[in-house]
């Protein structure tokens, strides 16, 4: 099977397996603010990541590329929608284009239709400095995502089995590539120990890519003759991973992704410490169901709904939203307690804007 054929299968299986909504975000509840003293017109949703200013705390997370015409059309539509809504967009792994020049167009279209937007290049942790620079140049990218997908590779029939040297390669790329580097998980979550190593390696941010969204173990198991189903429930749920990493490194930039389905999930993620939230499966389904117009409408609604929630929480800015009070219960509370994290960090903190 060619890489392009595999990419097409990934899209098909991502749509068929869907999102399984075990993110843990249901365990997070806002403390209601009765006197927000704020108008929606005052809300400022700008956020800063790696020295870059995003107009919105929402971004289109890495999905696809390198699968011929079908992935070309998906990336083209996503980028058009990103341009229309001023939302950053990430491409899927560009390794296919580095190995087959005919696939470059499936990625380059993102910059072609969105010449002034924020675009993330993307490679796996096996990449070299040379490959990282080529990926960034291909898109004139503003940032580089490096994805960690050990479980996906293990379950993938033709996947990698040797993960030695990844941290050293990431550190070398972060030092040399010339744009901010974000390291992201792909649906299995990130622990505070992994995040610590990555921050020490010099990355600008981590995207925790929590369990609860697109499940790459399930996707790859659909492609196997003998399934490895024990990996289908493997990972740290989004809410637990995000809270664990943020509370351990409150001064570092953390991004949220993994099963984020609506504005409430976005708002909760930011309250847990994220500087921005990435959606992939939600946008892919929106595009499939409603085309470009439907996708753009959903993106606009998402942004407006976040503003309304910020208003009722009395949070004028993203930084103020990151200080709002939330109560964590259920499995997420249990996880954090067992990991030595005091959840009153979130529930009793004060923000003078609230009352």
From Swiss-Prot:
Where found in the cell? Cytoplasm
Q: Which residues bind FMN?
A: 62-64, 93, 122, 184, 214, 258-259, 280-281
The answer to whether the entry has keyword Cell membrane is: no
Q: Which reaction does it catalyse?
A: isopentenyl diphosphate = dimethylallyl diphosphate
Single biological process term from Gene Ontology: isoprenoid biosynthetic process
- Keyword terms of this UniProt record: Cytoplasm, Flavoprotein, FMN, Isomerase, Isoprene biosynthesis, Magnesium, Metal-binding, NADP
| Pfam families in the record | FMN_dh
Q: Which GO terms describe its molecular function?
A: FMN binding; isopentenyl-diphosphate delta-isomerase activity; magnesium ion binding; NADPH binding; oxidoreductase activity
Q: Please give the cofactor(s) recorded in the UniProt entry for this protein.
A: FMN; NADPH; Mg(2+)
Please tell me which top-level EC class this enzyme sits in: isomerase
Protein residues bound to Mg(2+) = 153
Got a GO cellular component term for this one? Answer: cytoplasm
Q: What is its EC number?
A: 5.3.3.2
Q: Which Gene3D superfamilies match?
A: Aldolase class I
Entry binding sites for substrate: 6-7, 152
Which residues, by range, are in coiled-coil regions? Answer: none
Q: How does it assemble?
A: Homooctamer. Dimer of tetramers.
Q: What's this protein's family per the entry?
A: Belongs to the IPP isomerase type 2 family.
What is this protein's function per UniProt?
Involved in the biosynthesis of isoprenoids. Catalyzes the 1,3-allylic rearrangement of the homoallylic substrate isopentenyl (IPP) to its allylic isomer, dimethylallyl diphosphate (DMAPP).
- PANTHER family noted in UniProt: ISOPENTENYL-DIPHOSPHATE DELTA-ISOMERASE
Q: What is this protein called?
A: Isopentenyl-diphosphate delta-isomerase
Q: Which organism is it from?
A: Bacillus pumilus (strain SAFR-032)
The upper taxonomy is: Bacteria, Bacillati, Bacillota, Bacilli, Bacillales
């Amino acid at each position: 099977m060619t890489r392009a054929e595999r990419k097409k299968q990934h899209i098909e299986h991502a749509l068929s397996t869907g999102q399984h909504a075990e993110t843990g975000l249901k365990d997070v509840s806002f403390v209601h603010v009765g006197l927000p003293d704020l108008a929606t017109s005052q809300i400022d949703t700008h956020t800063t990541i790696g020295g870059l200013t995003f107009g919105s705390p929402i971004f289109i997370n890495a999905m696809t590329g390198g699968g011929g015409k079908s992935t070309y059309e998906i990336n083209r539509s996503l980028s058009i929608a990103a341009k229309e809504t001023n939302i950053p967009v990430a491409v899927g792994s560009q390794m296919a284009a580095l190995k087959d020049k005919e696939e470059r167009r499936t990625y380059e279209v993102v910059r072609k239709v969105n010449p002034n937007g924020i675009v993330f290049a993307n490679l796996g942790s096996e990449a070299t400095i040379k490959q990282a620079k080529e990926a960034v140049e291909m898109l004139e990218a503003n940032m580089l995502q490096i994805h960690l997908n050990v479980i996906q590779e293990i379950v993938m029939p033709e996947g990698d089995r040797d993960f030695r040297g990844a941290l050293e390669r990431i550190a070398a790329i972060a030092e040399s590539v010339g744009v901010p580097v974000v390291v992201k998980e792909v649906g299995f979550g990130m622990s505070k120990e992994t995040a610590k190593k990555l921050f020490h390696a010099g990355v600008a941010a981590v995207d925790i890519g929590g369990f609860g969204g697109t499940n790459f173990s399930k996707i790859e198991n659909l492609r196997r003759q003998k399934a490895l189903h024990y990996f289908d429930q493997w990972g740290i749920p989004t809410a637990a991973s995000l809270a664990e990493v943020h509370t351990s490194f409150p001064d570092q930039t953390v991004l949220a992704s993994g099963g984020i389905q609506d504005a409430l999930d976005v708002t909760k993620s930011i309250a847990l410490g994220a500087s921005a939230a990435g959606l992939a499966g939600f946008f892919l389904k929106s595009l499939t169901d409603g085309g470009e117009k439907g996708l753009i409408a959903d993106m606009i609604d998402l942004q407006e709904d976040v503003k309304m929630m910020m208003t009722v929480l009395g949070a004028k800015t993203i930084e103020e939203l990151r200080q709002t009070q939330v109560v964590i219960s259920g499995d997420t509370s249990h996880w954090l307690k067992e990991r030595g994290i005091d959840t009153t960090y979130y529930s009793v903190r004060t923000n003078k804007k609230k009352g």
